[in-house]
């Protein structure tokens, strides 16, 4: 019973929950980067580029810095923590989606603007030739 109480101690405050979200986000970022580099090296169809690796790492570091800097601004406000949890959840989902894209479990080559354009074409019933 003392072990359960000890584990519950880590979830008593919102600050510790934020630390767990940030840790999970960092783990997802590391796994995504390692898988991206590994698959780029192993796949002969993909040109291995150190510039792409540097760009990806720079983006991940900047996302983590922004996630850390958001904490002191969000905590004093009543709606700050739910907003922060939402942002952290969105970042984690984005990283997990990228990991699934590396593993070819999802189609990561979809063009969002093309999907929106097709949706509006179907709803309006007009084509580009109708203009």
Curated annotation (Swiss-Prot):
Question: GO CC annotation: what is one?
Answer: membrane
Q: Which residues cross the membrane?
A: 53-75, 79-101
Q: Which Pfam families match?
A: Phage_holin_4_1
Where does it live in the cell? Host cell inner membrane
What is the superkingdom listed in this entry's lineage? Answer: Viruses
**Which segments does the entry list as coiled coil?**
none
Q: Per UniProt, which keywords does this protein have?
A: Cytolysis, Host cell inner membrane, Host cell lysis by virus, Host cell membrane, Host membrane, Late protein, Membrane, Transmembrane, Transmembrane helix, Viral release from host cell
Please give, as recorded in its UniProt entry, the membrane topology of this protein: Multi-pass membrane protein
Family per UniProt? Belongs to the bacteriophage holin family. phi29likevirus holin subfamily.
NCBIfam families given in the database record = holin_tox_secr
UniProt name for this protein: Antiholin
């Amino acid at each position: 019973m003392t072990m359960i109480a000890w584990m519950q101690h880590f979830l008593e405050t919102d600050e510790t929950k934020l630390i767990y979200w940030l840790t999970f986000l960092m783990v997802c970022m590391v796994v995504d980067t390692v898988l991206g580099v590994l698959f780029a090296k192993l796949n002969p169809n993909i040109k291995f580029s150190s510039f792409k690796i540097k760009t990806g790492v720079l983006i991940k570091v900047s996302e983590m810095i922004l996630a850390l800097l958001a904490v002191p601004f969000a905590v004093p406000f009543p709606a700050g923590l739910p907003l922060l949890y939402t942002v952290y959840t969105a970042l984690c989902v984005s990283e997990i989606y990228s990991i699934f894209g590396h593993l070819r479990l999802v189609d990561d080559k979809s063009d969002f603007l093309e999907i929106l354009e097709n949706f509006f074409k179907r709803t309006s019933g007009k084509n580009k030739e109708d203009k």
